[in-house]
């Protein structure tokens, strides 16, 4: 098993796992295994901590998006994110909030991140906002939702 050295780890939040890591760690997308993408969700500070303090790394299993969905970009949707990766390959990826899993830090350390694609600093900030928005959002009571859907509610006239 690989050792952990906080000063030498290549792993950072927002990096993609290479296909050999995805396969070895059994992280295939449940519906689109041939289009699987896995992104590191854990914060850099947590990644730097020793395995005794932070034994796992959170990742999100996603896929290559067939096309960009504007309703899922810029962290507008708390459940789904479409985000662009650039570099040698430029493509859109889709990640769902419910597809977050934990990976053993030492197991992941046996592998290197996917080198040819990255998130721009702006897209990385969007990814962080999306992670936070899953837990920091307004909860509307059922009665509020019901009233919005009433046909005689004034919003329906506009």
Model-found features: residue ranges?
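Residue-identity detector for glutamine
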Residues: 10-13, 49, 128
